[in-house]
């Protein structure tokens, strides 16, 4: 779809307006606006230092939970593996759906990034949403959604008539860019630059004279 906002609207059409949608508070305001514009009832759930507060989550009326496990906006919180398991257990106990909004996760500073909820899910309760607007360019307006198998037939029946909002040529170019390894190399360069930027901001200028900038900003393919 043409960006994540378009996909948020499809989520409501797919899952229904008769559900309560739980959202992070504070969170990305446009998510609430899109859900509300599509007729969904939103329940704001307070954040702790590791995601949505556990007590608030246990009392929630929501049957759909929209979460941003990595760098939640505006708090910047990244949920732990234990919290991600808690979300999955919550969904399993209520037969609920999790919307994993994984924006910005490509830029994790951990050598071994945390697993996505979608990859941890064994019950088919996670819808994965991401976009290329940060990793490539905002002007591309390309987002994507990965559905669990149990929702695929429902999607085909209720929303399968929609034409894709991203031009076929753009999709083809991006597919080639990914399949030939350029996207991964591009991300590696961005991560190195991000690491250097963080490093330089936290080191005195006198210490930087010993650092090889040529290595950090290498123009090679890796």
Specify the residue positions occupied by each region the protein language model found.
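Structural signature of PLP-dependent enzymes
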Residues: 156-162, 180-197
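Hydrophobic residues in beta-strands of the RecA-like P-loop NTPase core, especially within AAA+ ATPase
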Residues: 23, 99-100
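Conserved core of the PLP fold type I
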Residues: 1-94, 106-107, 114-120, 124, ...
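Domain-scale detector for complete catalytic domains at protein termini or as standalone homologs
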Residues: 35, 57, 126, 140, ...
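Conserved glycine-rich beta-strand-loop-beta hairpin in the small C-terminal domain of fold type I
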Residues: 191-197, 208-222
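Conserved Walker B
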Residues: 102-104
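Active-site PLP attachment segment
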Residues: 118-154, 169
């Amino acid at each position: 779809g043409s960006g994540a906002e378009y996909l948020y609207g499809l989520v409501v059409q797919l899952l229904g307006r008769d559900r309560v949608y739980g959202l992070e508070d504070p969170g990305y305001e446009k998510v609430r606006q899109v859900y509300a514009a599509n007729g969904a009832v939103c329940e704001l759930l307070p954040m702790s230092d590791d995601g949505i507060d556990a007590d608030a989550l246990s009392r929630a009326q929501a049957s759909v939970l929209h979460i941003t496990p990595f760098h939640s906006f505006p708090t910047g919180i990244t949920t732990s593996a234990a919290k991600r398991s808690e979300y999955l257990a919550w969904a399993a106990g209520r037969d609920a759906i999790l919307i994993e909004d994984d924006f910005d996760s490509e830029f994790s500073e951990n050598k071994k990034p945390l697993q996505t909820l979608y990859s941890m899910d064994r019950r088919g309760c996670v819808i994965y949403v991401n976009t290329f607007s940060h990793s490539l360019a905002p002007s591309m307006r390309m987002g994507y959604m990965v559905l669990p198998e149990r929702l695929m037939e429902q999607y085909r029946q209720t929303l399968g008539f929609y034409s894709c909002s991203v031009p076929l040529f753009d999709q083809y170019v991006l597919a080639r860019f990914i399949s030939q390894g350029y996207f991964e190399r591009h991300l590696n360069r961005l991560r190195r630059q991000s690491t250097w930027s963080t490093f330089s901001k936290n080191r005195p200028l006198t210490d930087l004279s010993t650092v090889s900038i040529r290595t950090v900003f290498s123009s090679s393919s890796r």
